[in-house]
Design a protein with these regions (language model features):
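Basic nucleic-acid-binding alpha-helical/helix-turn surface characteristic of O6-alkylguanine DNA
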Residues: 1-27, 33-52, 58-164, 168, ...
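Short glycine/serine-rich loop segments
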Residues: 301-343
Length: 352
């Protein structure tokens, strides 16, 4: 089973979505209209533009960079990528009780069309709603097995109706039967929104091991590498470190936090570890060049290696590689996109 990453729909699907004014595509794309110079949310109430006048962007920042103005009707710069309230409620219910099974008939009793919630989960988690529930139950069963519970007890307690069905689902996730995964671990993952786009956070029992924007290049490669390094499977589930990091990021984006205290778990080489430690020494609102970072590390000639280690940082913002710029003052690279790097640097300077 693939790790959850943002699944991007094609042009036709996007154009049909704006015709329906479909709020389930919030955070998936932005619509820009060539004839008006304005960009909108997928759910904007304005008249649907002709297909030849439409261009789609992943983020509002990209539309701004290309000269488009935010729509005054749908206000696409406000609360970008917010998860609909009814989906937040359902996710909270499932995480509080992973044994719960919400079926299509249950959704209809809540006046929720199953196809709508299925489409939202496919767009934002690359899995169906029922697939998401199944992974939560697998995660719960795995925790029980790790604690010494019988496999059959864990399977039925987790809501599976047959042991064979549980074994098939378990093997699809872990690649092995329950009896051969005692040495494995689970990294819990959560998707949440920020003012500059949605993010994924992963956590082990030790701490946060990944914090990335959902549209980061090579994100699936990061998931795969992290899983191999920690001999773990990434699954939705609860973890106190995930609650901790979301709380501190809310404070950060409100301008009320300049240092983070959430524990981190950063597997890597000794050199990478030292580079990431130096990154965390760069003060809020300041920048360093790659040369200055190499000097601070005590390896002034290792500029290229330092840049490579920065690029392998899996924990955005908290390990602040966005504070490293080129010697000439230009932004240089950033896995989350240069528009976000500029936003973060401007924001930190403005909130010193």
């Amino acid at each position: 089973m693939k790790n959850p990453i943002l699944n991007k729909p094609g042009f036709e699907e996007k154009y049909n979505a704006i015709g329906r004014k479909d709020s389930l595509y919030e955070g998936v794309f932005i619509t820009a209209v060539k004839t008006t110079g304005i960009f909108c949310r997928p759910s904007c109430r304005a008249r649907k533009p002709n297909v030849e006048n439409v261009i789609f962007y992943d983020t509002a920042q990209q539309a701004l960079q290309n000269g488009y103005r935010p729509c005054k009707i749908c206000k696409p710069m406000e609360k970008q990528d917010e998860t609909p309230d009814y989906i937040q409620t359902i996710i909270k219910e499932l995480h509080q009780n992973p044994y719960l099974r919400i079926k299509d008939v249950d959704l209809r009793q809540r006046d929720i069309e199953p196809s709508q919630i299925r489409r939202w989960f496919k767009s934002h988690h690359n899995m169906t709603f029922h697939g998401y529930q199944r992974l939560l139950r697998i995660n719960t069963a795995f925790s029980g097995i790790k604690k010494g519970e019988a496999i059959s007890s864990s399977a039925f307690d987790s809501g599976f109706e047959s042991l064979s069905g549980f074994n098939d689902s378990y093997r699809a996730v872990f690649g092995q039967s329950p009896t051969h995964t005692i040495d494995k671990s689970v990294l819990n993952i959560v998707r949440f929104t920020t003012p500059i786009g949605p993010m994924f956070a992963c956590a082990s029992d030790t701490g946060i091991c990944l914090l990335e924007f959902t549209d980061r290049r090579m994100l699936e490669t990061e998931f795969s590498d992290l899983s191999k390094r920690l001999n773990a499977v990434i699954l939705p589930g609860d973890n106190p470190h995930l609650e901790h990091v979301q709380f501190e990021l809310q404070e950060y984006f409100s301008g009320d936090r300049k240092k983070f205290t959430v524990p981190l778990h950063t597997p890597g080489t000794e050199f990478q570890q030292s580079v990431w430690a130096v990154l965390q020494d760069i003060p809020y609102g300041e920048t360093r060049s790659y040369t200055q970072q190499a000097i601070a590390l005590g390896k002034p000639k290792a500029i290229r290696a330092v840049g490579s280690a920065n690029g392998h940082n899996r924990i955005a913002i908290i390990i602040p590689c966005h504070r490293v710029i080129a010697a000439d003052g230009s932004l240089a690279g950033y896995g989350g996109g240069l528009h976000r790097k500029k936003w973060l640097l401007d924001f930190e300077k403005a909130t010193l």
